[in-house]
Structure formats: C-alpha cells, structure tokens
Amino acid sequence: MTKIFAYAIREDEKPFLKEWEDAHKDVEVEYTDKLLTPETVALAKGADGVVVYQQLDYTAETLQALADNGITKMSLRNVGVDNIDMAKAKELGFQITNVPVYSPNAIAEHAAIQAARILRQDKAMDEKVARHDLRWAPTIGREVRDQVVGVIGTGHIGQVFMQIMEGFGAKVIAYDIFRNPELEKKGYYVDSLDDLYKQADVISLHVPDVPANVHMINDESIAKMKQDVVIVNVSRGPLVDTDAVIRGLDSGKIFGYAMDVYEGEVGIFNEDWEGKEFPDARLADLIARPNVLVTPHTAFYTTHAVRNMVVKAFDNNLELVEGKEAETPVKVG
C-alpha cells in the first residue's frame, strides 16, 4: 500500500486531511505536528512521499536524511520554495511540488480590508471607543473611492485585489515587469515604479521575494511617494525595509501601514507571547501604533484556502509517488 507521511499538521488542517483520506482508502496516511528536521525524518520511515509546510529551512542535511530513507518525493502545502536547498535537492534527485494558487481571494480580500481600515482610521477609533471616548474628531476617515490605488505585481492575487478596489470605486493603476496582456489593453499599467509611487494614495505589494525585490520599499522609494500614502504588504517581509517605514511613519509621510508579513517573522509569528518577554522591540513598536495594522501571516488563513492547501498537496504527492506528472511541479535546481 502506498504511504504518505505529513509534517506539521495543524488542528485546522485535520478535517480536510480526513476528507482526503476518506476519498483515498488505498493510501496509508500518517502525520505529526512536528516540523521536518534531520531529527524528525525517522518518523516518515517507510513512506513513499512526504507532505510538508514550514518556514524553517529544508537544509541539505534534512534532504539527505530523507533520501537516505528512500524518500525523494516532497509536496509543499504552500507556495514558497525559497527555503529549500535546491542544489542539494537536485543532486539527490528530488521531485517537489507546491500549491501556487490556493486562494487568491483570501489574500486579496485581507489586503483590501486592511487598506480600508487604515483609510478609515479604524484602529485609532477602536482604541478611543475602548477608552469610552466617543468623540468623532480627529479620527476622520478617507473613502476608498477617492484614492488612487497602486498595485505592484499583477499575478493571481494582485488581479483579485484590483477587482475588489475597483468595486469600491477606486482608480487602480499597476506595475509589473511581466505585463498581463488583458490588463495592458485596459490601460492599467504605468511605465515605472516611480510613476506608481508619484500617483498612488494606496500602494499594495503582490510580488515574490526575489533579490531584485528585497527592500523595494525603502527611504528612496518612500521619498517619491505622495504625502499620507498607505502601504500594504501581504506578500513577503523582505520586500519592505522596516526601519525606513518606521521613519516614514514618524515623519508623517506614511499615513498608515498594514503588514501581514515581517522580515524577522520566523520564530515570532504563530507563537503565543502573552505574558512573556516579546523578542522584537521593533515589531512591538509597530504593533503599538494606532496607524499600523499587524497580522501574523494570516492573510491566507481561511477554511477555503486551508482545504485547498491540504487537498492539492496530497493530490500532488500521490501523483509523484504513482509516477505521474504532478499538477504543480517545482523546478528543482
């Protein structure tokens, strides 16, 4: 019987895992809540493939340990593959899949909601109400329809975000080094990032974490932006120079910042710090600000998305194990 072993299975994933198991009675499924490390590879002994999800690196040592146990089929329940030692994976003959599209709507909706909350100064108003200060001023809001929304990256998520913001009545402009022909026909694209920075009241990032994009939001780019700009990052933490954003907030140039990702988030997000010493003073400062919205990498976190991540990853792994062409293979090496 085919056997698949899954790592880092969360409670919220178990109903969808059970659903997949019930539909595949001829496949033995075992799992753990532990991450995949050299020390936990032994748990998958006898498996034909593994299904994984973690921010921790898939190191050369981890991949070697899997290969030593006869396992070279690995399916991610997420998109990102930048934490995999691809050179080692290629050397060992790994086949890897990911889930590149599990719910663009989940992430795009979150970005749109957070942008609107910043514009309406919701956090500041909520804090006032909690103090029983029910005066209106000075927390007056801005309407989405009065904004020019700049979208950097027009892939699946960026396009859904554009549709949502247009639904509010905003004017939407976009920039992408790979232009979508349909969007280009409709005249969404500006010629450069500088053009977008100069025009946009709200800027939302929807690009990958590749070297060319690291700290694309920095002192220089912020200086080119409009006064009272709103910045939204639901993509990858390293896209933003956090210190530069803090300087922009302190100067008043940036009206508000919504962040679902953070360049130092590994080991901090998805952990309970209540009653404990918080490990990152800079992040604590951002969390405390009335014009900053912090969510711990949960833009994707909906039942729809989690189901797709589990089901598609297991489907992919079974296809690899059976020698078939997987639906969403990752280029190794």
UniProtKB/Swiss-Prot annotation:
Annotated InterPro entries: D-isomer_2_OHA_DH_cat_dom, D-isomer_DH_CS, D-isomer_DH_CS1, D-isomer_DH_NAD-bd, NAD(P)-bd_dom_sf
GO annotation, biological process: lactate metabolic process
Active-site positions on this chain: R236, E265, H297
Keyword Oxidoreductase appears in the UniProt entry: yes
Alphabetized CDD domains for the sequence: LDH (cd12186)
Pfam annotation, one family: 2-Hacid_dh
Gene3D superfamilies: NAD(P)-binding Rossmann-like Domain
Enzyme Commission identifier(s): 1.1.1.28
Binding site for NAD(+): H156, I157, D176, V207, P208, N213, V234, S235, R236, D260
Gene Ontology molecular functions: D-lactate dehydrogenase activity; NAD binding
Keyword set, alphabetical order: NAD, Oxidoreductase
Catalytic activity: (R)-lactate + NAD(+) = pyruvate + NADH + H(+)
Enzyme's top EC category: oxidoreductase
Keyword Repeat appears in the UniProt entry: no
Mutagenesis / variant outcome for changing R236K: Decrease of activity
Complexes and interactors: Homodimer.
Entry similarity comment: Belongs to the D-isomer specific 2-hydroxyacid dehydrogenase family.
Protein name: D-lactate dehydrogenase
Organism from which the protein derives: Lactobacillus delbrueckii subsp. bulgaricus (strain ATCC 11842 / DSM 20081 / BCRC 10696 / JCM 1002 / NBRC 13953 / NCIMB 11778 / NCTC 12712 / WDCM 00102 / Lb 14)
